[in-house]
UniProtKB/Swiss-Prot annotation:
PROSITE patterns: GST_CTER (PS50405), GST_NTER (PS50404). GO terms for molecular function: glutathione transferase activity; peroxidase activity; steroid Delta-isomerase activity. Homodimer or heterodimer of GSTA1 and GSTA2. This is Glutathione S-transferase A1. It catalyses: RX + glutathione = an S-substituted glutathione + a halide anion + H(+); prostaglandin A2 + glutathione = prostaglandin A2-S-(R)-glutathione; prostaglandin J2 + glutathione = prostaglandin J2-S-(R)-glutathione; (13S)-hydroperoxy-(9Z,11E)-octadecadienoate + 2 glutathione = (13S)-hydroxy-(9Z,11E)-octadecadienoate + glutathione disulfide + H2O. The modification N6-succinyllysine is found at residue 4. The gene is GSTA1. The modification N-acetylmethionine is found at residue 1.
Amino acid sequence: MAGKPTLHYFNGRGRMECIRWLLAAAGVEFEEKFIEKPEDLDKLKNDGSLMFQQVPMVEIDGMKLVQTRAILNYIATKYNLYGKDMKERALIDMYSEGVADLGEMIMHFPLCPPAEKDAKLTLIREKTTNRYLPAFENVLKSHGQDYLVGNKLSRADIHLVELLYYVEELDPSLLANFPLLKALKARVSNIPAVKKFLQPGSQRKPPTDEKKIEEARKVFKF
C-alpha cells in the first residue's frame, strides 16, 4: 500500500492551500514537510526534487509532482473529483480557472504596499461582486442542481468553497446577494471530510499575516 502523500511547502497558505483542501475533501490523509529556511529549499533543489526549482511539491504514488495545476489535476482524477467525461472536465477546468483568477488577487492582497491596500481591496470587492460570484451563482441557478457540474461533487466545488471562505474573511457582506453560493458553501462544509478539515487543529492554514509574510520572504527571498 502506498504511503500518505507528502506536501513540501512553507507553513502557510500560499499555493499549497488549494491542494490541502482538495486532499482533505477527498478524505486523504497527508503529511507535511515544512520549508522553514532557505537551506531547506536549497536541499530540495540540489537533490533534484524540484523540476523547475520551485514549490509546491507533492510526493504521491512514487512521483514528485510540481506545478499547482498538475498536482490538482492528478488528485482530482485519482479521487474521482473530475467529472465523468471530457465535457464535464472542460466545465470543471473553466470554473476552476475562474476561481484561481480571483483567488490569485486575494492571495496577493497581504503583500500589497500599505499605500495601495485600499485601492486593491476596492478592486477585489468589485471583481468579486460584479464578475466572479454572479457567474457562479448563475451556473447553479441555470441547472438548479446541488453542485456546479453533473450534480456531483467535483474539484470545482471544493475550489469555489475554499474561495468563498477567503471572500468572507475579507468582507462577510460580499456573499449577501448570493444565496445559492451560500447554500453550496454550507453543503460542502458539511461533508464529513471537509467538516473535519474546517475544525481547529487540522492542517488547514490560518489567514496570512505579517509574521507569515516575513517567514516566506526569508525562505523564498522575495
